[in-house]
Amino acid sequence: TTSQFVFAMGLNNLVTDGAVANSDYRYWGSHFYEWGMTYNTRIAKNNNLLHFKYGFSVMYNNLRPTENRWFVDNGTTTDLEVNPLHMGESRLRNVNLVLPMHLEFDFSGKTIKDDKTYYNTHKSFRLGIGGFAGLNFKTKQVIEYDIDGYESRNVTKGSFNANDFIYGLSTY
C-alpha cells in the first residue's frame, strides 16, 4: 500500500436546458479546489494491473453568477435574482468532505532483482474508474459591494437548499 497527497483544481459550471452555453455562471470564475490523501493497494499478490485506490478529500466548489445576480433562499428553492446593489463579487461556496474509491489499472511493469520480484507503481499509464460519496459541511455566499466609497463584504452561512449528502461517478 502506498499513500499520496492529492491537490486538484478545475472549473465548475451547470448544465441548463441541456447545454453549458449561455450559462448563468462565469466560466472562468466558477471553479473547485480539492486536497486530501489517497491510499493505493495492489489487489493481486502476483500481478500489478489492478489496484484499489481510496482516501479522503476536502473539496471547495465555487459558483459565481453572471449579470449582478446572487443566490436567494426562498424556502424550498434557491433562486438567482438580480441584486439592487452593484456587486463586485458574488459567490456561492460549498465545502464537502468526500471519500473517493476507484479501481485503478496500473500498466507499470515489474523488476526482478536478486530473484525477487518488485512491482513498480506510477511508472506508466494509469486509469481509474469509480466514484465518491461525501457530506456537505458548509455552504456560504460571499458578496462584495461598494456604497458611496465604503467597501463592504457580507458572508451569509446557511443551507441554501444544498444537499447534505453528495455522490457521483468519477474517472481519471
Protein language model regions, located:
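Short loop/turn motifs that connect adjacent beta-strands in outer-membrane beta-barrel proteins
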Residues: 2, 42-50, 108-124
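Residues that define the transmembrane beta-barrel architecture of outer-membrane proteins
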Residues: 3, 27-33, 93-99, 123, ...
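Glycine- and aromatic-enriched membrane insertion/assembly motifs of diderm outer-membrane
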Residues: 3-4, 9-14, 22-81
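Membrane-embedded beta-strand positions of outer-membrane beta-barrel proteins
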Residues: 5-9, 52-56, 101, 127-131, ...
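Transmembrane beta-strands of outer-membrane beta-barrel pores
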Residues: 9-15, 58-64, 105-109, 131-139
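Extracellular/periplasm-exposed beta-strand and loop segments of Gram-negative cell-envelope proteins
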Residues: 18-28, 64-94, 137-148, 152-166
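Transmembrane beta-barrel domains of outer membrane proteins
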Residues: 38-40, 90-92, 102-106, 170-172
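A mid-sequence, solvent-exposed acidic-amphipathic segment
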Residues: 111-142, 156
